[in-house]
């Protein structure tokens, strides 16, 4: 499965580009979390990962727009994958990171049993801390049965809109059955009964994290960077660049990919595409000076796809044995490949 990650694209924009995306050889589109989030007026790239609850509708589109997108995508032979943020909610800012924001839905905010301990992770190599404590945000206890009902009601609503798959944000921070948490067992059953699939990001390379990754693979595909090994390669979803590696630059992320050129990305992705069954290509923002969104007017991608670029793309990704022998096109294929 070849997935294109359309971070911060409005649903109506995606709908207009479906035919071109299909021509590029993709099987599925991954879109933003559809949950409401704080700070829409002062949008940052991470804003949609601080949700206010489990319902559909935000600046990228409402429930009806999601239904239309799914219907149109299916007409073009494309699956729709929605990013879901279940591990945490929006907080009260840096000075009060572990308490939910006042705009978080009352059914969550007012129920004390829904929340993890109000403390942060100190040892990121300690699996218990990473799954039981907060990650700079108010953590939700996904082992709570009442909370699970709310979450699965939301996932069912996504399915009813036509969604095919789910990308579980912060999956490595959600406990597994070996931790005494049954959430992903229920997720597996839900997806089986609803003919859906899902994947969750699991990072870390030591023995403890490899064990966590291998257990996760019993329930979801494992989303992990190039170089990760897994016994069942069909359970691996591989990427080289993600929104985190491109947008989250600074001392906390020395391995960012901002310096990669368009040629680097074309070459790397063409290789991954031939090496792995399941791959994701992240589309960078259109304006490198405004990396938080595609433009001021609504995250559009005007005139990105042109016929000669589509032909170039297909030749590079599908046919060329050596991408380095092909000259860089005058007009780049995807926004941000500067």
Task: Kindly give the residue locations of the regions a language model identified.
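A residue-level signal for beta-strand positions that form part of recognition/binding surfaces
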Residues: 1-3, 236-237
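Substrate-binding/active-site clefts of carbohydrate-active enzymes
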Residues: 2-16, 24-26, 30-161, 178-202, ...
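Active-site-proximal helices and loops of the catalytic beta/alpha 8
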Residues: 16-22, 33-35, 40-46, 68-82, ...
């Amino acid at each position: 499965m070849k997935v294109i990650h359309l971070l911060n694209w409005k649903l109506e924009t995606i709908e207009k580009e479906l035919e071109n995306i299909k021509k590029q050889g993709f099987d599925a589109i991954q879109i933003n979390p559809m949950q409401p989030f704080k700070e829409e007026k002062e949008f940052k790239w991470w804003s949609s990962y601080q949700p206010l609850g489990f319902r559909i509708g935000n600046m990228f589109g409402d429930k009806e727009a999601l239904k239309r997108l799914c219907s149109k995508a299916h007409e073009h032979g494309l699956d729709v994958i929605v990013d879901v943020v279940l591990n945490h909610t929006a907080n009260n800012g840096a000075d009060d990171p572990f308490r939910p924001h006042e705009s978080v839905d009352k059914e969550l905010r007012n129920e004390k049993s829904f929340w993890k301990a109000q403390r942060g992770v100190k040892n990121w190599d300690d699996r218990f801390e990473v799954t039981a404590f907060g990650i700079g945000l108010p953590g939700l206890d996904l082992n709570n049965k009442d909370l699970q009902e709310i979450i699965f009601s939301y996932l069912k609503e996504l399915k009813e809109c036509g969604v095919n798959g789910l990308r579980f944000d912060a999956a490595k921070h959600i406990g597994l059955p070996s931790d005494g948490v049954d959430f992903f067992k229920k997720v597996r059953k839900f997806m089986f009964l609803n003919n859906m699939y899902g994947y969750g990001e699991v990072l870390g390379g030591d023995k403890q994290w490899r064990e966590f990754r291998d257990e996760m693979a019993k329930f979801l595909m494992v989303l992990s960077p190039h170089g990760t090994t897994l016994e069942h390669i069909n359970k691996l979803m591989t990427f080289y660049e993600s929104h985190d590696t491109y947008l989250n630059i600074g001392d906390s992320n020395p391995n960012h990919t901002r310096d990669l050129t368009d040629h680097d990305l074309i070459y790397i992705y063409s290789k991954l595409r031939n090496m792995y069954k399941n791959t994701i290509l992240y589309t960078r923002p259109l304006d490198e000076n405004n990396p938080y969104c595609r433009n001021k007017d609504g995250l559009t991608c005007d005139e990105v796809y042109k016929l000669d670029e589509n032909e170039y793309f297909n030749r590079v990704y599908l046919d060329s044995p050596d991408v380095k022998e092909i000259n860089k096109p005058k007009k780049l294929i995807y926004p941000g490949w500067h």
